[in-house]
Design a protein with these regions (language model features):
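Terminal domain-start leader segments
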Residues: 1-342
């Protein structure tokens, strides 16, 4: 695992240059996703562990990977000879990440994280807990200049999810969201969860394996809505659809300027468990912040008649596929020895 050791050494050099004593790398993305695009697989790149759940924390001398029991065997194999210790979550003898860091560092030391990769709530909790030991949490991306051959963000165009499948128009969905915003006394709603955005704007994509989502952000206010997405992902058809539904389109990174430009007298609604700290820091301190579960999360949980019918059709197809598998298995097991990989 020479390559992993070299990456750890490069990161530790960056830590020293930045005056940082520890760095935390989760296995998520700026949208609080568990299943993520290759571009954001930072934890996998630094450790070699490619399970869907896990976090790496390292100091200038030690490193550990925290993951749950699903991955104890896999992580043990993939971390071999990397100098990264496997920290088995759920066992009484395993300290949590912040407790481990607090023990390894001293008062006055700094811990760094990429604020894009942590939700507002998780960042605040870490900051508060570390402060009890006199340790400061700082926002800095130390991997951007180290991971030089990083994959590009997905560029495949997204597509419109037709109302015959969605069962509700974008106009009606925005009306429902604005009604919920009014109840929460919010002028602006900032969205970052990809499933929420796909549902609200009736769009789908192939940006994340096995998840039909589009990498984007969104802002909804009392009179307008804006989708922040890479221009190359838009087609004439999708742009026309969004414009017909009074949805503005801007570049993916333009979300930061949009957040900074929100007037100081406005109230901004964010889901603290989903919205990342980097975006949150872009909002003026003078703006009022409302923290609540995303209204979209609740709205999309209640299925309309079209969606329920779609589920029924999907279950029929799923049942046919499972029946075919059972038939195949019943015939094969009589003739040969089968394994999980057969």
């Amino acid at each position: 695992m020479k390559e992993i050791k070299e990456r750890l050494a490069a990161l530790r050099k960056a830590m020293k240059d930045a005056g940082v004593s520890a760095y935390i790398i989760p296995g998520t993305d700026p949208h609080a996703g568990e299943y993520i695009a290759e571009y954001w697989k930072e934890r996998q790149w630094i450790s070699g562990f490619d399970g869907s759940a896990g976090t790496v924390a390292l100091t200038l001398e030690k490193a550990g990977l925290w993951t749950d029991s699903r991955y104890f065997l896999q992580a043990g194999i993939q971390l071999k000879d990397t100098t990264i210790d496997l920290m088995k979550e759920g066992l009484s003898e395993t300290p949590d990440i912040i407790s481990w860091i607090s023990k390894e560092l001293k008062a006055g030391d700094k811990v760094a994280v990429n604020p894009q990769m942590f939700s507002v709530n998780s960042y605040a909790k870490m900051k508060k807990t570390l402060a009890l030991s006199g340790i400061e949490l700082v926002s800095v991306d130390l991997l951007k200049n180290i991971w030089t051959n990083r994959p590009t963000l997905p560029q495949e165009p997204f597509f419109v999810y037709d109302i015959q499948y969605a069962g509700e128009s974008v106009e009606d969905k925005l009306k429902s969201v604005r009604s919920e915003m009014k109840k929460l006394h919010a002028n602006v709603f900032a969205l970052s969860a990809l499933d929420d955005i796909a549902w609200l704007f009736n769009i789908r994509g192939n940006d994340v394996d096995y998840n039909p989502v589009v990498i984007a952000y969104a802002l909804v206010d009392e009179n307008s809505a804006t989708l922040f997405v890479a221009p190359e992902k838009c087609t004439p058809v999708s742009l026309e659809f969004l414009h017909q539904n009074q949805v503005n389109v801007s570049g993916y990174e333009d979300i930061y300027d949009a957040l900074k430009s929100i007037p100081a007298d406005k109230s901004v609604l964010v889901d603290g468990d989903k919205f990342n700290q980097s975006l949150f820091e872009a909002i003026s301190e003078k703006c009022t912040k409302q923290f609540a579960m995303s209204p979209v999360f609740r709205l999309k949980a209640v299925k309309n008649k079209v969606e329920m019918n779609g589920v029924r059709k999907a279950m029929i197809k799923d049942g046919v596929a499972l029946t075919r598998f059972f038939m195949w298995l019943e015939n094969k097991v009589k003739k040969e020895n089968l394994t999980e990989m057969s």
